[in-house]
Amino acid sequence: MITRRQSTEIRLGNLTIGGSAPISVQSMTKTDTRNIPATIAQIKELEECGCEIIRLAIPDMEAASALKSIRPKVKIPIVADIHFDYRLALASLSAGVDGLRLNPGNIGDPERVKAVVKSAKEREIPIRIGVNAGSLPKDLPPELTIAQKMVKAAMGHIKILEGLDFGLIKVSLKAFDVPTTIEAYTQIASLIPYPLHVGITETGTPKTGLVRSAVGIGNLLYMGIGDTIRVSLTAPPHEEVFAAYEILKSLNLRQRGPILVSCPTCSRTEVDIVGIASQVQEALNKIDKPIRVAVMGCAVNGPGEAKEADLGIACGKGQGLLFRKGEKIAVVPEDELVDALLREIASL
């Protein structure tokens, strides 16, 4: 059983993060924030997928102003992603965002940092310090490893906020390299009490990015590290949300929707099990029930091998078996197997 690191609790809109709260799933819009209708539509789609926190890039004042129209139209907490310009942070706070992602050390003048912190404190808005291995300060000691530099940079930003008596802090330390990311998070986890947002950055397209993210995020979560997660992919954001829940489900940390179990096929397979499994997965994506469903390619061994499944089909040429918890329910013609399975799921 996984024992989670105990972090302080913060509130992000209507969501509790840290402490004993469930690990939250986050994504980021891929739209131009200034395109208000497109951004609202994408956030609503993500809400339907189970996204619990959404981050929006705020490159200029027009984007910050757009938040005034976006915030009332969506339900989940909005985090404004700010780089360098403190005025964008102030405008985003005035627009009603639920959180900021910025590094106070990059803002410059201490008075500007104070202005942002003062506004955030008045509104009880948390700030996420987000350190990225690709954009570390140039003045860090060269003898340090990348992970050590990430931790040192994060601690510098944290001390600025703590020096202003601000404690609504969340921290992330992301790199493309999985071992570097794991090393950075394990180091900082023992140094600070604040919630940690976990992810691997710039992972690429789903084919490679899903693997890299699952290895990195999964390892950290198994060690009990992580209060929110994002699977960063060069793909539509709903794919990030789906992948995040699959990682959490695989570690028994969250349950949302069905889990599909399907065999890898072998020479005993006499049907298009790949196509059948894909068809079932597509249907399961529209179902919220936290059940385990099996699609097996062998009517002889399938039910026994998938006896942990709530429901399943074992496919044979011409016909197959519909089973529950490994016990046969019915023999079904091959071309009716998927429909029979879905009807049985609907009856649960």
From Swiss-Prot:
EC no. given is: 1.17.7.3
Q: Read off the HAMAP family from this record.
A: IspG
Q: Which InterPro entries match?
A: Dihydropteroate_synth-like_sf, IspG_bac, IspG_bac-typ, NO2/SO3_Rdtase_4Fe4S_sf, RibuloseP-bd_barrel
**Cofactor binding comment, as recorded:** Binds 1 [4Fe-4S] cluster.
What keywords sit in the KW lines? 4Fe-4S, Iron, Iron-sulfur, Isoprene biosynthesis, Metal-binding, Oxidoreductase
User: What gene does this protein come from?
Assistant: ispG
Q: Name one GO molecular function term.
A: 4 iron, 4 sulfur cluster binding
Residue spans making up a coiled coil are none
Q: Which Pfam families match?
A: GcpE (PF04551)
- A GO BP annotation: isopentenyl diphosphate biosynthetic process, methylerythritol 4-phosphate pathway
Q: What does this protein do?
A: Converts 2C-methyl-D-erythritol 2,4-cyclodiphosphate (ME-2,4cPP) into 1-hydroxy-2-methyl-2-(E)-butenyl 4-diphosphate.
Q: Does the keyword tRNA-binding apply?
A: no
EC class, as a word, reads oxidoreductase
Name-wise, this protein is 4-hydroxy-3-methylbut-2-en-1-yl diphosphate synthase (flavodoxin)
